[in-house]
Swiss-Prot record:
GO cellular component: host cell endoplasmic reticulum membrane; membrane
Function: Plays a role in viral cell-to-cell propagation, by facilitating genome transport to neighboring plant cells through plasmosdesmata. May induce the formation of granular vesicles derived from the Endoplasmic reticulum, which align on actin filaments.
Organism listed in the record: Cymbidium mosaic virus (strain Singapore)
Similarity comment text for this entry: Belongs to the Tymovirales TGBp3 protein family.
Note: TGBp1, TGBp2 and TGBp3 seem to act together for cell-to-cell propagation. TGBp1 is the main movement protein that physically cross the plasmodesma with the viral genome. TGBp2 and TGBp3 would facilitate TGBp1 function.
Predominant location: host cell
UniProt keyword list: Host endoplasmic reticulum, Host membrane, Membrane, Transmembrane, Transmembrane helix, Transport, Viral movement protein
Biological-process GO terms, alphabetical: transport of virus in host, cell to cell
Superkingdom in the source lineage: Viruses
Ranges in the topological domain labelled Lumenal: 1-23
Compartment list: Host endoplasmic reticulum membrane
Protein name as catalogued: Movement protein TGBp3
Residue ranges, Cytoplasmic side: 47-91
Transmembrane spans: 24-46
Length: 91
């Protein structure tokens, strides 16, 4: 017969046919939801934040994407160089 299972077990009795209960549909759905949440969390964690960039050359200091440029300038020993300018490129 097509669609029946007559697989003998260790006791010699055949296995009953699989039931079409609601749990057969709920379990894969729950697994799919858990997988989707895990994927979204993994994508969110691996998204990099913009870097705080400080570029110092002989003519200027450029600070980009830093939340508190004044604190950075206090920690950097800046001498009174001739022609030095400061640029804050916050985005």
């Amino acid at each position: 017969m097509l669609g029946t299972r007559n697989i003998p077990t260790t006791s010699g009795l055949p296995l009953p046919p699989p039931s079409s209960s609601l749990s057969a549909y709920i379990f894969p759905t729950i697994l799919a939801i858990i997988f989707a949440v895990f994927a979204l969390v993994a994508i969110h964690i691996t998204t990099p934040e913009p870097f705080c960039t400080i570029h110092i050359d002989g003519a200027s200091i450029t600070i980009t994407n830093c939340p508190d440029p004044a604190a950075i300038l206090n920690k950097v020993a800046i001498g009174p160089w001739r022609g030095l300018s400061y640029h804050n490129n916050l985005k």
